[in-house]
Amino acid sequence: MFRRPRSLRRTSRKEPAVTSHHLTDRHRAALPPWMPLSYTDALEIVSGRGRTVRGGDGRDYLDFYSGVAANMLGYDVPQVREAIERQLRTGVVHTSTFYLIRSQIELAERIGRLSAIDDPVAFFTCSGTEAVETALLLATEYRRSRHVIALRDSYHGRSFGALAVTGDRRWQGAGLTPLSVDHVPGGPVRADAGEDWVASCTRRLTRVLDDAAGPVAALIAEPVQGVAGAAPLADGQLAAYARVVRERGALLICDEVQTGWGRTGRLWGYQWDEDVRPDLLVFAKGVAGGLPLGGVVGRRDVMSCLPMPSVSTFGGNPLSTAAALATLDLIEERDLTTRALHTGRALRSLLTGGLHGLASVRRVQGRGLLLGVAFQDPATAGPSAAVARAVQEKCRENGLLVGLGGTTGHCVRVMPPLTVTDDEVRQGAALLVQAAREVDQHWRNS
């Protein structure tokens, strides 16, 4: 039997369900149409504690999406809250990078040590998109080339350059770009892809590099393709790519926006393969416990190549970096990286076993606590966004929040906070399995 999420402490806030419709109308009137909302009846989250949130509908939900992985430690974390409040009491929320910021310097030193990059230097931004854009600027300037290689089905952000290297077909052709971009294979379609797949991918990358008219700036890669539905690269694929790129003098940019900080069961997703050493590493999402913070850490010679002075007005601000230091303290003190490995294996096993035999389920994929369930139409065996959406809706009915992804929208994304308990893993898995079984039964009977 599964249990509903435990109740949060009641507040004086009025939370009538009817307000969501009015708020949705205001959202659609004031914000662009390309900002989608989850669920037929859109949800407002009004409070949270641990891994449980309360919606504007008055219901409590177990959150297995974590604000798209940004609420990495969950909600109302005392140590992070205290670090933020301590900084707020100084009266200084922002100064800009024209001034010394102690917490920014301490965080840069710490991330440099954790990156495993030789002689590292860090630069802070406000988001993963901005961090990717910075990495592309550095790589193209360092190599004096605007030619970048990226992976198919990847997603790197919604800015000019980040969209150019994004390999997800839904975002291609969205606008002009100053970059020349080639795409090589990302994660394999089959879960059992092995050495033959890696060899084929490596040959494709080699041809692109050898056929280039001039130097190639970089290869940018996600170790696990998050928006694609938590699709990991095959074992050895990133290492093979890194070797070929290094032999030809191009840089390796690892986009760890979703995979960083222990979520995959390694501190960095690139560490699932041996002999991978990125030249530039991009991070964001959960590093500041839910506050906006991103950045790039990389080799000193690459990070020092810009010919003009540059600043980041809000990147690395005192408030976000104070929260980030507290977040990293908790990751290390509680060994959340190892915990993500073990709880991720348990969650994946529960999902795989519970979903076995369902005609609408393709596979469970991912690493650690970055997981995806791929769905298909039982009649055609083609990927089905409609089935995935129905499962997401049914999960909410059951009291569980999950996300959507996949190159055709056919995946349910499962990314609970790294602090998720064993009981919550079992509870969340049971709720998702129940939802998928109900949808599968309905789909086969319709």
Predicted regions and their residues:
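Short, Lys/Arg-enriched N-terminal segments with co-localized hydrophobic residues
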Residues: 4-17
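Conserved N-terminal phosphate-binding loop of PLP-dependent enzymes in the Aspartate aminotransferase
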Residues: 18-446
